Amino acid sequence: MKNLTTLLILILIISGPSFANKVNIFEFTDTELSELEVRKVRGADNKTEYSVGSNDNGNYLKAVADNAASGLGKKVKIDLNKTPIINITWKVEKDLVGIKENTKKGHDFAARVFVIKKTGATPLSNRAINYVFSSNNIVGFNSPSPYTKKSIDN
């Protein structure tokens, strides 16, 4: 995974924004929200509640979790030669205090975006980079997932 991360960083350095094509993955509409795949996290009591809103900056997705964990998924093929940059904007209203995010018990984040590269026939063979909004670490931190060596939390 270290090589993958290094490769990703090199691609980002070599390819400036002027060379990148913009691909909007989400439009954040009620119709789109109803079509997204929702996956409840094993062991969670409830699913996260999702809704769509808008403000001066455009549409957004709001997620509220109370003893809940789930994710929204959308499969998209991206050509990294044409679109090597990911741009994530998020607003967190409440940090998760008192947890150790790099442990299985505390592996929780106020916001998280998974970028998964399919590398084999099963989900366990995939590689992932998880862009996270950490409540307890400095900007730029990264850590291997406590669940698998094939996933890095950034």
Give the residues covered by each predicted segment.
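Short carbohydrate-recognition loop motifs
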Residues: T48-G71
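Extracellular/luminal beta-rich ligand-recognition
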Residues: D108, R112-D153
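Solvent-exposed strand-to-loop "edge" motifs in beta-rich extracellular domains
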Residues: T89-D95, K118-G120
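Extracellular/lumenal carbohydrate-interaction signature centered on repeated Trp-anchored short motifs
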Residues: K75-I86
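Residues that flank catalytic or metal-binding motifs in active/ligand-binding sites
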Residues: N24, N57, P84, H107-A111, ...
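Extracellular carbohydrate-recognition regions
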Residues: A20-G43, Y131
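Positively charged n-region of N-terminal signal peptides that target proteins for export
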Residues: M1-T5
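Bacterial N-terminal signal peptides
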Residues: L7-S15
